[in-house]
């Protein structure tokens, strides 16, 4: 009798994240980005962050930055999809790009150079996740351009690169917010033309009655 193969969650999770980083590096950055240390970190009030040159090898010769994703927003039955989590990964990869090829500002600030790079990869910077938000600033998130480079790259991404492990509840402060399995996902949609917003079930096709435009999913904040 052959021994049962044990599922190794750490290996599965970080292998998928590394492969996703390499995939988007190739598809959106032409393999121009250096490697980083990918981590999961429950930094408060943020989906993810990038820190430059914070890791080194035993000899102190090589240095790497860190990209962290917040597991409190990688929930099994939460509002954020794998697509939105990987949009955060690409957001932080744009910070990495700016560190080496752009005009890097002070940490966590999103300047015009950053906003333009984000747009080129198919993400629009916004202070509130809608077209009405400010494109630059200290606290800026983004929304996904439908049919843009990131959207198309995600659709073509192999299934094995999807996130294999999701958290069952969020650890925010000292409380544990249990997620009910039967609860339908509710997200905020916005009109890319007029900025009107509406709540609805995830996956619903909603048209703006004023503009007759398909409404897009609004995302939260990144650093």
What is each of the regions a protein language model found here?
Residues 87-100:
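Active-site recognition of the HExxH zinc-binding catalytic motif
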Residues 4-80, 100-223:
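Metalloprotease/metallohydrolase-associated module, dominated by Zn2+-dependent proteases
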